[in-house]
């Protein structure tokens, strides 16, 4: 029995690289698709937002001389590439998926609106929402917060490379300790980098809880959905 009826799953573009230095690792993509299939089989309604950092990141482009708006638009297109890849992998796993885009680009994907996304999820399709918010200066974390709120998700599941939120970066500080759960106020007070400030405040103001967990460990997504105590819960 799944603990949530409808979720927004945020996936890191960088995680799609797997062992590669750039692009999409087919093995990692297949593992993600299989994990998503497992919770889809539980009857969960699934919306997904994927980053584009494995291909291009607008902010890093700006630091190298790109115009920020054009750089962000390149980043949005990177999320569409990743979304098409995941959609294809889900199809191969026997799960019907639909790509919606925040910018019109038919026939690559359908133009996003809330009602279309909800109807598709209620009909058993996995909905992958790409191209961020369609606007520059917004991260994919902010895009996933917005979409999670719009589709009335019960929770945002933020799949990362680490197994939750720590007092400091566990990859740099061996004394860092993990939170099992933490409030939004505490996240903001401590300046913890769960997501960017805009995304965090949106979730707080709209009472959308987040579970941060390690998506790269196969089986973890189902464990989160069936109530096992992994990751970190962020809530009001």
From Swiss-Prot:
Pathway in which the depicted protein is active: Pyrimidine metabolism; CTP biosynthesis via de novo pathway; UDP from UMP (UMPK route): step 1/1
Enzyme class, spelled out: transferase
Activity regulation: Inhibited by UTP.
Family: Belongs to the UMP kinase family.
One GO BP annotation of this record: 'de novo' CTP biosynthetic process
Residues the record lists as binding ATP: 10-13, 53, 57, 160, 166, 169
GO MF annotation, one: ATP binding
Cited HAMAP family: PyrH_B
Keyword Kinase assigned: yes
Domain of life: Bacteria
Main location: cytoplasm
NCBIfam families given in the database record: pyrH_bact
Keyword tags: ATP-binding, Cytoplasm, Kinase, Nucleotide-binding, Pyrimidine biosynthesis, Transferase
Protein name per the record: Uridylate kinase
Higher taxonomy: Bacteria, Pseudomonadati, Bacteroidota, Bacteroidia, Bacteroidales
Subcellular location: Cytoplasm
Record keyword Kinase present: yes
EC number: 2.7.4.22
Residues binding UMP, per UniProt: 52, 72, 133-140
CDD domains, sorted: AAK_UMPK-PyrH-Ec
Function summary: Catalyzes the reversible phosphorylation of UMP to UDP.
Alphabetized InterPro entries for the sequence: AceGlu_kinase-like_sf, Asp/Glu/Uridylate_kinase, Uridylate_kinase, Uridylate_kinase_bac
Subunit structure: Homohexamer.
Any one GO cellular component localisation term in the record: cytoplasm
Reaction catalysis annotation: UMP + ATP = UDP + ADP
